[in-house]
Amino acid sequence: MKVWLASLFLCALVVKNSEGGSVLGAPDESNCGCQNGGVCVSYKYFSRIRRCSCPRKFQGEHCEIDASKTCYHGNGDSYRGKANTDTKGRPCLAWNAPAVLQKPYNAHRPDAISLGLGKHNYCRNPDNQKRPWCYVQIGLRQFVQECMVHDCSLSKKPSSSVDQQGFQCGQKALRPRFKIVGGEFTEVENQPWFAAIYQKNKGGSPPSFKCGGSLISPCWVASAAHCFIQLPKKENYVVYLGQSKESSYNPGEMKFEVEQLILHEYYREDSLAYHNDIALLKIRTSTGQCAQPSRSIQTICLPPRFTDAPFGSDCEITGFGKESESDYLYPKNLKMSVVKLVSHEQCMQPHYYGSEINYKMLCAADPEWKTDSCKGDSGGPLICNIEGRPTLSGIVSWGRGCAEKNKPGVYTRVSHFLDWIQSHIGEEKGLAF
């Protein structure tokens, strides 16, 4: 009997007439509540079972979810996309979750369908707040939290990524020769946005290499906050652009003092991970100049808000870091390698990093575990191709060991910090999104 019923279910067909309409007593569309052009249909052998047949791009029980929407207009009251985390990366609760059913806005309201609420956890704005939101579980309570989805009006790119000083973000003078296993030494012309940050030493001795960074505008370098947490004074550091060899003069290099050092106000560290690991350095030469474009000095493009390259994409990492954790000395030449982005689901597996990973981080690794960012690479760039141009997707942050199996490098996810960057840099010329 069970086998017969299962076979019958498999053979159930939606029957339509020659004009595309459903037959066999198909119900009025109002009985299904289909939206966005969805059609209410019934099955050949189970005519009382009704559902919405959704047009392409639309999903959900009532075709109420628009999978193509990645941003919102106005205050987002009409947003029907699939964003489902708050601004800190915490997952939203489903609108039909038991705890949410006790809240004013839930999937069981009579007007739930018109408000976009249903058997899902996607962000909505049913009560006309400033932007889409959701309920988030924090401890034992549920809170209303704004969502990690951006305003469409802020996502429009400028017609050109060339600023008034002649920079063109993401442009290289040389074509790299990718060699994944172990990486390869490279000229800075392959990574002209790379910034070498040195810590000054007492007694007049030469400064020591501290961390990498990335030139995101003529006057600003992005790096990792953990590089500076022990000595957070700007006077302790000097920055070089256009440098292929550490502590050596390079033709075309420029030296800068740090005019301003900004660490993320919510930076913290635990037993393994760094959180909100991002810093900004405002740079000036001794004569008050910002960076000048050349073959060896160029800005890197910033990603669109909350947008990253697909998982599995090849990305470049660059730095003066150690080649293995056991090395005593750092290499003197700039080195570049290629790694692949690892999905959050994979990186959150217990045998990877588990709960140490959140949605403000990116993971990347060599599939053969032979290449990785290592000690000394901190603050340097993870460059991925987004919409056809090299983009600063990540900042080298932390990881367990170097090229250790199932322990990818972890990077600050730049696309989730653009509002923070812009709030400090303001209308600075040359910031290329």
Curated annotation (Swiss-Prot):
The modification Phosphoserine is found at S159. One of its GO terms (cellular component) is serine protease inhibitor complex. Residues 71-152 form the Kringle domain. Transmembrane segments: none annotated. The active site is at H226 (charge relay system), D277 (charge relay system), S378 (charge relay system). InterPro entries: EGF-like_dom, Kringle, Kringle-like, Kringle_CS, Kringle_sf, Peptidase_S1_PA, Peptidase_S1_PA_chymotrypsin, Peptidase_S1A. CDD domains: KR (cd00108), Tryp_SPc (cd00190). One of its GO terms (biological process) is urokinase plasminogen activator signaling pathway. Residues 153-179 are annotated as: Connecting peptide. It catalyses: Specific cleavage of Arg-|-Val bond in plasminogen to form plasmin. Belongs to the peptidase S1 family. Found in high and low molecular mass forms. Each consists of two chains, A and B. The high molecular mass form contains a long chain A which is cleaved to yield a short chain A. Forms heterodimer with SERPINA5. Binds LRP1B; binding is followed by internalization and degradation. Interacts with MRC2. Interacts with PLAUR. In complex with SERPINE1, interacts with PLAUR/uPAR. Interacts with SORL1 and LRP1, either alone or in complex with SERPINE1; these interactions are abolished in the presence of LRPAP1/RAP. The ternary complex composed of PLAUR-PLAU-PAI1 also interacts with SORLA. This is Urokinase-type plasminogen activator. It comes from Mus musculus (Mouse). The lineage of its organism: Eukaryota, Metazoa, Chordata, Craniata, Vertebrata. The gene is Plau.
